[in-house]
């Protein structure tokens, strides 16, 4: 059931075995540590740099990083991911009568509201028909709400993909999202 899947964990793990980058310390010299951001469906707390930790009167979490040598410190994940499930990507796809397998999203920096969770991102991927990958599709927009999407996850794959530094995800089967485009 979707409610069982929602009880999975969202982790921030600077030492994740297959991570593209591992960090013992953040750029402020604070030790990095493994954190369950969401555990059993319950939000455990924010990631913090020294500045945000001071503002909220909490301990820093080792998440103060510079995006460039000239940049300022911001709060960033080390390796943020939804903990993998037990189904293969092919097993998940085989359960979809008609849908879309999204392989890429662009514009998260501009198309995601971190407060409300609303998102609107350019996407590309493949049509799924009768449980099989069909034709490729590009330049469509995927819209929804992150928190609602998390509640509507029906299956989690065992195939974490590390495509970006700092963020990874296994294949997710989501009940529905809004799609627009040709």
What are these regions (language model features)?
Residues 3-182:
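N-terminal small-residue-enriched
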């Amino acid at each position: 059931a979707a409610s069982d899947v929602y009880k999975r964990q969202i982790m921030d793990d600077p030492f994740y075995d297959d991570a593209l980058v591992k960090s013992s310390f953040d750029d402020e010299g604070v030790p990095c540590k493994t954190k369950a951001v969401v555990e059993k469906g319950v939000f455990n707390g924010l990631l913090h740099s020294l500045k945000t930790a001071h503002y909220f009167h909490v301990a820093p979490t080792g998440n103060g990083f510079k995006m460039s040598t000239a940049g300022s410190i911001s709060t960033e994940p080390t390796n943020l991911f939804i903990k993998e499930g037990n189904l293969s990507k092919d097993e998940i796809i085989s359960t979809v009568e008609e849908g879309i397998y999204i392989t890429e999203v662009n514009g998260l920096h501009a198309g995601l509201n971190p407060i409300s969770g609303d998102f609107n991102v350019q996407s590309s991927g493949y049509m799924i028909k009768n449980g099989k990958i069909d034709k490729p599709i590009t330049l469509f927009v995927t819209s929804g709400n992150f928190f609602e999407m998390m509640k509507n996850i029906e299956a989690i794959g065992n195939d974490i993909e590390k495509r970006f530094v700092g963020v990874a995800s296994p294949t997710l089967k989501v009940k529905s999202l809004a799609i627009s485009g040709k």
